[in-house]
C-alpha cells in the first residue's frame, strides 16, 4: 500500500478529523492553464490527449505542480469514453462539443450495445490511472470518475450535447422499458469501469450526473438515482487496505439531497444553487458534502474570492465532512492566479473550523 503524504481529502470524505478543509477543483486540469494548452497542442486534439497515458498523466499533474495546496488529483479523461467503447464513435466538432457517429434510437440499438471490458476496451484509461499513481508516489490521492447512466444515455440518444433532451425524454416517457434497458446496460458498464479504475489505483471515485437535474422529481428517482445506487452497491469499497469513498454529484440536484444521502455514497457534490449549511442540516451527518462555490466567482478579484470562501466555510461550520470545491467545473477564461487565490483562502481560512 502506498503511504499517502496527504490524506486529508479521503479523511474528510469519511468525516474523520482534518487540520484544514481539503480542496480540489472540477476541471482543475484544463484550458485555463497555459501548460495544459501546450500539452493539448502537442497531443493534436482532445481525444488523442485522453488516449495517451503519458500525456494524460502530464496534464493530471500540472495543477498539482502549480498549486501545492491541492489535496487531490483527478484522472484526466472524459465521461464519454464509455459510450465510445460501446461502439458509438465519439468525435469532437469545433464549437459544437462532443458528437457520436451512431445514435441509440431503438430497442434493437440498445440490445446491440456491448458492455465494455475495462482492460480490453478502455485500457488507455486504466494505463493512465496506473501511470498517474506511479508519478504521484503518495503525494495526494487520485480520484477516478464516470458519468452517470442517465447522463451518458442523454448523449447516446441525442447524438451529442442537448439543451432540451427532447429525444431522451421522449424515449423515457414513450418507451420507459427501452430507457430502462439502456440504463441497466450503462449501470453495468459504469460499475465495471469504476471498479477497473479502483483496481488500477483510483483511491476515490466520483459519479458525474451532469443532467440529472433536468428530470422531474419522480423521473430522477426512477431513471437516475436508482441506477447510481445500483452502481454504488456494485463497487469495490476496500482496496489497498483503505476505504474507497464514492462521491455522487447531480448538478441541479439540490431538491433531492435527502434521497441522495441514502444512496450508499460517502459524499454528495453540491452545485452552487444550494446553501451548504442547509444541505448539512438536511443530510443529518449521513454523508460528507463537496462544494460548492459558483465557478464564476473566480472571475472576481482575489479579495472577493476570499470573501466567498469565508462565507461558505462559515455556512458549513465546524468539523470535518466538507471537501471544498466549485459547484461545477472551472471555466477556460479564469486567470490561473485567481484559482491559486481560491486554494490559498480555503486552507488559510478553514483552520479555525478544525481546532
From Swiss-Prot:
Q: Which residues bind substrate?
A: 27-31, 78, 155, 210, 328
Query: One Pfam family this chain carries?
Result: URO-D
Where is the protein situated, by its record's location annotation?
Cytoplasm
Alphabetized SUPFAM superfamilies for the sequence? UROD/MetE-like (SSF51726)
The lineage's top-level taxon is Bacteria
User: CDD domains under this entry?
Assistant: URO-D
Role, per record: Catalyzes the decarboxylation of four acetate groups of uroporphyrinogen-III to yield coproporphyrinogen-III.
Assembly, per entry: Homodimer.
Q: Quote the catalytic activity from the record.
A: uroporphyrinogen III + 4 H(+) = coproporphyrinogen III + 4 CO2
The root-end lineage is:
Bacteria, Pseudomonadati, Pseudomonadota, Gammaproteobacteria, Pseudomonadales
Please classify the protein's predominant subcellular localization into one broad category: cytoplasm
Which pathway does this polypeptide act in? Porphyrin-containing compound metabolism; protoporphyrin-IX biosynthesis; coproporphyrinogen-III from 5-aminolevulinate: step 4/4
- Record-level GO BP terms: protoporphyrinogen IX biosynthetic process from glutamate
Task: Please identify the protein, giving its name as recorded.
Answer: Uroporphyrinogen decarboxylase
One cellular-component annotation, GO: cytosol
Q: Which GO terms describe its molecular function?
A: uroporphyrinogen decarboxylase activity
Marked site (Transition state stabilizer) residue numbers: 78
Kindly give the InterPro entries that the UniProt entry links to this protein. Answer: UROD/MetE-like_sf, Uroporphyrinogen_deCO2ase_HemE, Uroporphyrinogen_deCOase
Q: Which UniProt keywords apply?
A: Cytoplasm, Decarboxylase, Lyase, Porphyrin biosynthesis
Q: Which family does it belong to?
A: Belongs to the uroporphyrinogen decarboxylase family.
Q: What is its EC number?
A: 4.1.1.37
Amino acid at each position: 500500500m502506498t503511504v499517502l503524504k496527504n490524506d486529508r481529502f479521503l479523511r474528510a470524505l469519511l468525516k474523520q478529523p482534518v487540520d484544514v478543509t481539503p480542496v480540489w477543483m472540477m476541471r482543475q486540469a484544463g484550458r485555463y492553464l497555459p501548460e495544459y494548452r501546450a500539452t493539448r497542442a502537442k497531443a493534436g486534439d482532445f481525444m488523442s490527449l485522453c488516449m495517451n497515458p503519458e500525456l494524460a498523466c502530464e496534464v493530471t499533474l500540472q495543477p498539482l505542480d502549480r498549486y501545492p495546496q491541492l489535496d487531490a488529483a483527478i484522472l484526466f479523461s472524459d465521461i464519454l469514453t464509455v459510450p465510445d467503447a460501446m461502439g458509438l464513435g465519439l468525435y469532437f466538432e469545433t464549437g459544437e462539443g462532443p458528437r457520436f457517429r451512431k445514435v441509440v434510437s431503438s430497442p434493437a440499438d440498445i440490445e446491440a450495445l456491448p458492455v465494455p471490458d475495462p482492460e480490453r476496451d478502455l485500457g488507455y484509461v486504466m494505463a493512465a490511472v496506473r501511470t498517474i499513481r506511479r508519478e504521484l508516489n503518495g503525494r495526494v490521492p487520485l480520484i477516478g470518475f464516470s458519468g452517470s447512466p442517465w447522463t451518458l444515455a442523454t448523449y447516446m440518444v441525442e447524438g451529442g450535447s442537448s439543451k432540451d433532451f427532447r429525444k431522451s425524454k421522449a424515449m423515457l416517457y414513450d418507451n420507459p422499458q427501452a430507457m430502462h434497458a439502456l440504463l441497466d446496460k450503462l449501470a453495468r458498464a459504469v460499475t465495471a469501469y469504476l471498479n477497473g479504475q479502483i483496481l488500477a489505483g483510483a483511491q476515490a471515485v466520483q459519479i458525474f450526473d451532469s443532467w440529472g437535474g433536468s428530470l422531474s422529481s419522480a423521473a430522477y428517482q426512477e431513471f437516475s438515482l436508482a441506477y447510481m445506487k445500483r452502481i454504488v452497491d456494485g463497487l469495490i469499497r476496500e482496496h489497498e487496505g483503505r476505504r474507497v469513498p464514492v462521491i455522487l454529484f447531480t448538478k441541479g440536484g439540490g431538491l433531492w439531497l435527502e434521497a441522495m444521502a441514502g444512496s450508499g455514497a460517502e459524499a454528495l457534490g453540491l452545485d452552487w444553487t444550494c446553501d451548504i449549511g442547509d444541505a448539512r442540516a438536511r443530510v443529518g451527518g449521513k454523508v460528507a458534502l463537496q462544494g460548492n462555490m459558483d465557478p464564476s466567482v473566480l472571475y472576481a478579484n482575489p479579495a472577493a474570492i476570499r470573501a466567498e470562501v469565508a462565507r461558505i466555510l462559515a455556512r458549513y461550520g465546524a468539523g470535518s465532512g466538507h471537501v471544498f470545491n466549485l459547484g461545477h467545473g472551472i471555466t477556460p477564461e479564469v486567470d490561473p492566479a485567481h484559482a491559486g487565490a481560491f486554494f490559498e483562502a480555503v486552507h488559510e481560512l478553514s483552520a479555525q473550523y478544525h481546532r
